């Protein structure tokens, strides 16, 4: 059994990891909140929580792959480039890996919530609801990116609408994780 401070820290790191994933602020072509930092925070969270649920440890290799991908993309941005869009098959593999990683991560957090939340709380259901929304949004982004050539007249509107939904969903995900970590502080 993991102590409450470790659980609090693990959930906090994941919540802040989502901050780095959802808030991509650029100076020119370079992100000042790079996504790979978010992945490193997830990996740190996984390390802290792996004794609590075996599935956390199983996410580690995929987290490393995504961290390397995001770091490579961030380094390419310093040269004005990007890793996305050059190999469609590789983009698809990364999209699927990203969806699976986040789906499983939130599934594991919901399972932890069932174990630690107070009777009558519904943190687990809240985490699962936002997990599902995030998965749908990531799938929609992946599909519309593949269909960009056919949506050219509407592309700006489609990406703007998806960005707004994605941002709202991300804020809700982070708020759910920050609410979940309170379980460990109050105990």
Residue spans of the language-model regions?
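N-terminal topogenic module of multi-pass integral membrane proteins
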Residues: 1-45
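Membrane-helix boundary/juxtamembrane motif in polytopic membrane proteins
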Residues: 107-140, 180-187
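A generic, lipid-embedded transmembrane alpha helix
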Residues: 55, 62-79
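Juxtamembrane "helix-exit" motif on the non-cytosolic side of transmembrane helices
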Residues: 24-26, 75-84, 143-155
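C-terminal transmembrane-bundle signature of multipass membrane proteins
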Residues: 43, 136-187
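Non-cytosolic membrane-interface motifs at loop->transmembrane helix junctions
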Residues: 83-94, 154-164
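Membrane-interface helix-boundary motifs at transmembrane edges
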Residues: 47-60, 83-84, 114-125, 185
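Membrane-interfacial loop-to-transmembrane alpha-helix junctions, especially the N-terminal start
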Residues: 5-12, 53-64, 127-131
């Amino acid at each position: 059994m993991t102590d409450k401070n470790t659980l609090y820290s693990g959930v906090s790191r994941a919540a802040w990891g989502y901050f780095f994933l959802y808030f991509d602020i650029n100076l020119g072509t370079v992100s000042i909140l790079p996504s790979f930092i978010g992945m490193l925070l997830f990996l740190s969270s996984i390390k802290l929580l792996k004794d609590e649920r075996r599935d956390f440890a199983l996410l580690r290799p995929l987290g490393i792959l995504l961290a390397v991908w995001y770091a490579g993309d961030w380094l390419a941005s310093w040269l004005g480039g990007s890793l996305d869009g050059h190999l469609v098959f590789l983009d698809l593999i990364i999209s699927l890996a990203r969806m699976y990683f986040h789906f499983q991560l939130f599934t594991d957090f919901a399972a932890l919530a069932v174990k630690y939340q107070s009777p009558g709380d519904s943190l687990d259901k809240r985490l699962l609801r936002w997990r599902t929304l995030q998965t749908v949004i990531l799938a929609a982004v992946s599909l519309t990116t593949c269909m960009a050539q056919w949506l050219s007249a509407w592309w700006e509107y489609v990406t703007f609408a998806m960005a707004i939904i994605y941002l709202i969903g991300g804020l809700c995900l982070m708020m759910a994780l920050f609410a979940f970590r309170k379980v460990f502080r109050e105990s």
